[in-house]
Amino acid sequence: ESRGLGDVYKRQMLAQGFQERGDFAKSTTYLREAIAAEQDAVQKELLLVRLSMTELAAKNPTAAAVAANEAKALNPNNGMAYFALAQAYAASAASCSGLEGQAIFWVAYDTMTQAANLLANDADAGNFAQTARDAAANYRRGFPTAEECFFNELMEGARYTITCGPARGIVTTVRPR
């Protein structure tokens, strides 16, 4: 078992080194290997959040969302998993056209607000709760305007299902900017 722990640690260190050099492909490969070898759920959860953030840096929002959701599944109270997930949703908005790209910000906002709430109750989170609140406020600026909602026949308060990107299938609430 100690050999396994050494292997996990070695992979983490290799991932860190490649990440520092900007080689995100190799970094994520080693992080995935470390996750596969990790037996401790708490450590696996931390590695998944790290993988999500590395995938974001590599401009892979879908892979980032998958890793963040896996971390969330291990611990639904992990504010950092929500923090990474919200960023993944927001990063994917540019790949969705028109109103759909703006609608993703509803989900990013909701997810980042959840992150802020969870991080505010986490003594180890430092300033991340405020960073999450600031990011949520920024995502609000991406919401469609009242006019855009009107022309797309969307009523404020109505339910809306995202149809693009890693947030596809998530139901949210229509809100103008």
Model-derived regions: residue spans:
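Short coil/turn linking the two alpha-helices of tandem helical-hairpin repeats
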Residues: 42, 56-59, 86, 91-100, ...
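TPR alpha-solenoid repeat register
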Residues: 10, 44-47, 81, 125
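Terminal, low-structured helical/coil segments at or just beyond the last alpha-helical repeat
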Residues: 114-177
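Structural register within alpha-helical repeat arrays
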Residues: 14, 50-51, 85, 92
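Single conserved hydrophobic/aromatic residue that forms the stacking wall/gate
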Residues: 1-9
